[in-house]
Design a protein with these regions (language model features):
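Terminal presequence/propeptide segments associated with secretion/organelle targeting
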Residues: 1-181
């Protein structure tokens, strides 16, 4: 998962970094967003480096081999734990694509273009309207939403968001190419 997540975040960061270099207003608008996106990006890069440096995959494989030998050489353990690692691998393989797809969606929708989060911010208003119609409660929620929108637009640049949307949509489709009709 980390390589895909790093790639998605790097794609967003490339668009944001280029825009931030273009003018001071955009640099100020996107400083916190860039930082938020890059924190996990840097963490995952560090995790991958650490796993390689410590040869974690090789050590895991050696430990699994030792476990299988111990189990195989002990009848009681073999009856109880024989085939356990194979079953775990089968379960992991069965869910691997679902986990990947879930995290790809999260990276695209929740950490990608602000357009998605912006649209989602209206969900409460839609539900209130469906439940209570044109009520005072709906009007009050609408006023709160207006205040939220003012803060949103203060640090929003539609050109940057479109750039992120375009770049991430291409990545998203590339990663999902095997699932498309």
């Amino acid at each position: 998962l980390n390589p895909m997540r790093i790639d998605m975040r790097a794609t967003s960061l490339n668009v944001i970094d280029a825009a931030m270099r273009s003018d001071d207003k955009t640099r100020i608008q996107y400083a916190a967003k860039q930082s938020r996106i890059s924190n996990a990006y840097k963490k995952w890069i560090g995790q991958n480096r650490g796993l390689k440096k410590l040869k974690a995959v090789k050590k895991k494989q050696e430990t699994e081999k030792e476990f299988e030998e111990l189990v195989h050489n002990n009848k009681e353990w073999n009856d109880q734990y024989g085939g356990l690692l194979a079953k775990l691998k089968n379960n992991q393989d069965a869910f691997e694509q679902s986990f990947f797809d879930r995290w790809l969606f999260i990276e695209y929708v929740y950490y990608g273009p602000e357009l998605f989060r912006f649209a989602n911010s209206f969900e409460k208003l839609v539900k209130l309207y469906e439940e209570k119609g044109n009520s005072q409660e709906l009007r009050n929620a609408g006023l709160k939403q207006t205040a939220v929108l003012e803060g949103f637009y203060k640090d929003f640049n539609s050109d940057v968001d479109q750039g992120i949307f375009k770049a991430l949509t291409e990545k998203y489709l590339d990663y999902n190419s095997g699932h498309l009709p």
